[in-house]
Design a protein with these regions (language model features):
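Acidic/His-rich, metal-assisted hydrolase cores and their charged scaffolds
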Residues: 1-249
Length: 249
């Protein structure tokens, strides 16, 4: 799916819906927030935000003009409760089933302002990050228990991966033409595959380094090497007198 397809999916789900719509997505996905606000405005719905991270992102994106929000579309959460359900959209945090996120609290009747009503259409516009499947399933089950219609199936084209495909990685390597290449971020098998891609794109094997946490990388104009290691990982501090710990900690 493409971002255009996601917008089309939103349009279909809003069209003819006479119930309240609650959408959860990644708070950092500014473009997705813009898509939701656009389709809400198209169908005459007011939009409210719940979830601190979502509120902060929307505020900063608006100030920096990264988003175009039509006049009179946004309303406070307290006000949206007083409007007809078919005229409202709530954008919420909690797409990964995080405990104490806005959607989680709504699902388990712990949200102070929003109560899930039978017929509410809940749209999960995000894919599950590996490891979060169980918590997301619990939230979805609770929403169904409360009579909500939950739309989350990956075949509905409600989310697009933010990670580059192999062809996009190839294009980036072709544009940048790096002399040295260090694949980062992801599981080790992913780094191996990315390194193979670099070799396919003409980077000399000796100039490709796969470095695990703690490895020291030395780069000069002519060469790159990775031989030494330093201690790296979680550091747990118990008390204020352990090591060189500043008062801020």
């Amino acid at each position: 799916a493409s971002e255009r397809k996601v917008g089309e999916s939103f349009d279909k789900l809003f069209m003819g819906c006479d119930k309240r719509i609650i959408i959860t997505t990644f708070a950092s996905n500014v473009h997705r927030l813009q898509q939701i606000i656009n389709v809400a405005s198209k169908y005459g719905r007011k939009v409210a935000i719940t979830g601190r991270s979502m509120e902060n992102v929307l505020k900063v994106a608006s100030v920096l003009s990264y988003m175009n929000i039509p006049d009179d579309v946004m309303v406070d959460l307290d006000k949206v409760k007083k409007l007809p359900h078919n005229k409202t959209v709530i954008i919420s945090t909690g797409s990964q089933g995080e405990a104490m996120s806005a959607l989680y609290r709504m699902a388990f009747s712990e949200h102070k302002q929003i109560k899930i009503d039978a017929g509410d259409r809940v749209i999960i516009s995000a894919s599950a990050i590996p490891g979060n499947e169980n918590t997301i399933s619990r939230v979805i089950d609770e929403l169904f228990h409360k009579g909500a219609e939950v739309i989350y199936d990956r075949n509905t084209e409600l989310h697009v991966s933010g990670h580059a495909s192999q062809e996009e990685q190839k294009m980036m390597l072709a544009l940048v033409k790096p002399k040295f290449f260090i694949p980062v971020h992801g599981e080790y098998r992913m780094l191996i595959k990315h390194a193979e891609l670099g070799r396919q794109m003409g980077i000399a094997p000796k100039n490709i380094v796969i470095a695990e946490n703690g490895k020291v990388i030395e780069i000069t104009k002519k060469a790159i090497r990775c031989e030494e290691s330093v201690t790296a990982g979680a550091v747990l501090v118990d008390g204020s007198g352990v090591g060189e710990v500043g008062s801020v900690v």
